[in-house]
Amino acid sequence: MAVRWFSVLVLVFSIGAQALLYDGVHFSGNGETPTFWRNQAKASLLKRANSRRIEGVAKNVIMFLGDGMSIPTVTASRILKGQLAGNTGEEAALSFDKFPNTGLSKTYCQDSQVTDSASSATAYLCGVKANIGTIGVDARVRHGDCASQKGAELTSILDWSMAAGKSVGLVTTTRVTHATPAGLYASVADRGWEGDYYTKNIAGGCKDIAAQLIDDYPNVQVIMGGGRRYFMRADQTDPEHGSNAHYGRRDGRDLIQEWKNGQHNMNRNYHYVWNASAFNSINAANTDSLLGLFEYSHMQYEFERTDPNHEKAGEPSLAEMTQKAIEILKKNPKGYFLLVEGGRIDHGHHEGRAKLALHDCVAFSDAVGMGDQMTNESDTLIVVTADHAHTMSIAGYPQRGNDILGKSAHGSTLTAAGDHRPYTTLLYADGPGWAVTTGNHRPDITNVDTTDKHYLQQAAVPMASETHGGDDVGIFARGPMAHLYTGVLEENEIAHVMAYASCVGDYSNHNDCAAALAGK
């Protein structure tokens, strides 16, 4: 196995109180000199020139999926992270910015220029592009047609990893039955079939997503996210929400209890938790299986998660869930596969509330940093990507350090548009932020607090929910075979590289994998 090494370059600069250290280089926040920029470029160049490919087998694979994490989202979140630390922001770095291998993913699906999270999950987890709105089935399946899914089911990187004897897990801030995590284990003609509330009247007898997880995948050792409502009976009471009559199960099954019974029958030391205190009490060293359902529906936005007035029961952060998952899964000598989704980036964008989306993206970066810190690049492949883009853009010519959530400005002077009214740096092409005043004028936001969490960025086209974007999205990777993610890839290739690197699925015998694994 090739070993990565770096030369060490020490650069000393005279810096101000607000300087930022990144990759050994101090950024002073718009006071950099020509010499500074030359030295910064040399340091970055030498680091990349001295890097070496890691071509061994990936014992472990962690996929971090930022739902809706478009390139503008990455850029704006990077700036926000820097500004939250008291710096100008542009020179900051998200945890995965430092990964040595980057590429682009083409996200269109089989029948749509702009994909959704269901068909995209099928691509990057199952290795096959499929029709919009479907999960874990090939393109023969028509959206919503239960009968057409029979015989068209696909397997995923989770299946391939389990077949190789690895431990597997999933972590998300959405419902664990939502499109991204469901791509690991479910096969449905309609992503909306999360519980039998939706499938009870569908001809063909297709099983809902929650039931597929509990019935067909008892060996998924870590499951964390939200979505208790689809696992509980309709007559049960949720500990936070109360009545479950609307979304609860009509088949009389208590899937949480069934999960417990199944783990008990397999002689596993298991835990089911639904709040932060119970989560914090878990000792990963003696835990075999963990089911954590921390919300009735999706988990809270990161900006609201720590607000006791908003979230009384408490929820772990995405980074904390990532840490616990790795601690549990890493005990398997054959390795593990873990999917971690920052799912509410997408929801913030759909609502037209950029602040919520960006704060969730910063929290997602923290989770990636946790995974990077806890693992070794010599045996663990980490790949970070998004499933699709959004329509948010970074516009105008704001000065360096201008509040990324604020109005475009130079100093105290707001930048005026053609209608002589100010505008924010972040805008959406469509969404709920569209509005006109009497006389069909764009609203004047001069005295509006655009940094408030409830503020809707202005949009050009009226939509109840902002749409996805068809842009390519970034891929950031480190570890064994991470160099295979360079260039422009079809989204379905992402799954194949993970399988190739870890010697599972169709690639279990490539390049004498058996011999390489035997020598570990």
Model-identified regions with their sequence ranges:
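A post-motif C-terminal structural segment
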Residues: L20, S28-K42, I54-K59, M69-T75, ...
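Glycine-rich phosphate/pyrophosphate-binding loops
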Residues: E153, L158, A163-G183, S508-N511
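Classical eukaryotic N-terminal signal peptides for Sec-dependent ER targeting/secretion
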Residues: M1-L11
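His/Cys-centered metal/cofactor-coordination and adjacent catalytic loops
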Residues: G136-G151
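Structural beta-sheet core signal
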Residues: M63-F64, L170, V384
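Alpha-helix C-terminal capping segments
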Residues: L125-G127, D159-G165, D216, M374
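N-terminal signal peptide
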Residues: L11-H26
